[in-house]
């Protein structure tokens, strides 16, 4: 399943909408997403599953590039 993750790069700063970044990640659940991103110390604001028509829309209208977390 593909997830869209909204995050701030610095865990210590107050979230500001203009600084929110987005990445797409393949994982089995939201818990798995948070586990994979835990080592980066991101301030994760929201994790959203992307499927069906929403996924097709993101592929056409966004820079949908799956992040590879090692």
Curated annotation (Swiss-Prot):
GO terms for molecular function: DNA binding; DNA-directed RNA polymerase activity. Its EC number is 2.7.7.6. It is an enzyme of class 2 (transferase). GO terms for biological process: DNA-templated transcription. The keyword GTP-binding does not apply. Keywords: DNA-directed RNA polymerase, Nucleotidyltransferase, Transcription, Transferase. Gene3D superfamilies: RNAP, epsilon subunit-like (3.10.20.730). The keyword Transferase applies. A non-essential component of RNA polymerase (RNAP). This is DNA-directed RNA polymerase subunit epsilon. It comes from Bacillus mycoides (strain KBAB4). The gene is rpoY.
């Amino acid at each position: 399943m593909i997830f869209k993750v909204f995050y701030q790069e610095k865990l210590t700063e107050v979230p500001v909408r203009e600084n929110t970044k987005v990445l797409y990640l393949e994982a089995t659940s939201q818990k798995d997403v948070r586990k994979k991103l835990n080592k980066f110390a991101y301030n994760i604001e929201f994790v959203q599953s992307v499927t069906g028509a929403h996924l097709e829309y993101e592929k056409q209208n966004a820079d949908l590039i799956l992040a590879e977390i090692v």
